[in-house]
Regions:
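Short glycine-rich anion-binding loops that position phosphate/pyrophosphate groups of nucleotides
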Residues: 44-47, 70, 157-159
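Short, well-ordered secondary-structure micro-motifs within conserved domains or adaptor modules
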Residues: 33-53
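Catalytic phosphate-donor-binding core of small-molecule kinases
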Residues: 1-36, 72-152, 160-263
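Glycine-rich phosphate/dinucleotide-binding loop and adjoining beta-alpha-beta core of small-molecule
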Residues: 47, 51-66, 76-79
Length: 263
């Protein structure tokens, strides 16, 4: 099996990377940074997000597994002290593939069209922190006029991240959906929004129409893009998915409990 390892630059992560690389190569596996069959992320969820964006062109051919060098993350199943167990399981190919949905973002600007994939979430705000003014459409029909700090569109697995801090719902990754959550919306007699998170199934699209004369800040996970002349943005459940190699059962709701309410 061809593998590659993406790790943080701290000593613990680098040491873990060196050990896993050496042991996998001892067992006849080849490190291949160009076309890996499995990508091992060592660090935190941010490290895995970076690995995802680095290899998103290979989503149909590869899978991910996380080793967390801090506290357990949502995308990590192993700690560094479990490296030998992970190595054995990879060697024996004792895993199942679990697929998580992604959000596809299509941006139309004066300069053409941009397409992005997000694993956690994508947001739209104003660059200078002023009020974002957009028309919102669902399924090709006008839904509302939004005024506020911004909007957040998250995946089910990303619903536990920024979306949760905004008061959005937590969604199990088995649901093929995206979630729209408002960021500090303005609601009064003049401006009125739905005020609740909206969960859209895979056959629905979300469209927003900003003011083309404004400069907007578009985020795709940890990536930031400053864009001018945006005429519209389309959000939907992506056709692509991210595949995780699951070597043991670790339910989503157990991860939620351990991260947020377990003492």
């Amino acid at each position: 099996m061809r593998f590659t390892i993406i790790s943080k630059n701290d000593e613990k992560s680098k040491k873990t990377r060196s050990y896993i690389t050496k042991e996998l190569e001892k067992r006849g596996m080849k490190e291949d940074k160009i076309k890996p069959e499995i990508i091992i992320s060592i660090g935190g969820d941010g490290t895995l997000l970076g690995a995802f964006h680095m290899y998103q062109h290979l989503l149909s051919e590869t899978m991910f597994v996380g080793v967390h060098t801090g506290n357990l993350g949502f995308y990590a199943d192993f700690h560094p002290e479990e490296s030998d167990l992970l190595i054995d399981l990879i060697d024996r190919k004792e895993f199942v593939k679990t697929e998580f949905p992604l959000v596809h973002v299509k941006v139309h600007t004066d300069n053409g069209e941009e397409n992005h994939l997000a694993l956690n979430e994508t947001t739209l705000k104003m660059v200078q922190g002023s009020t974002l003014a957009i028309d919102v459409g669902i399924g090709g029909k006008h839904f509302e006029k939004f005024r506020g700090d911004g909007i957040c569109i998250s995946t089910p697995s990303g619903s536990t991240a920024y979306n949760k801090s905004l008061g959005g719902a937590l969604i199990h990754p088995s649901f093929q959906s995206i979630q729209l959550t408002e960021i500090a919306s303005i609601n009064n007699r003049v401006f009125r929004t739905i005020g609740s998170s909206i969960i859209l199934p895979s056959h629905h699209t979300l469209n927003v129409y900003p003011n083309k004369n404004d400069t907007h800040l578009l985020t795709i996970d940890h990536l930031h893009f400053q864009l001018n002349g945006i005429s519209s943005i389309e959000y939907k459940v992506a056709e692509e998915t991210i595949k995780f190699a699951r070597f043991r059962h670790f339910p989503f709701w157990h991860r939620v409990r351990e991260s947020f309410i377990s003492s």
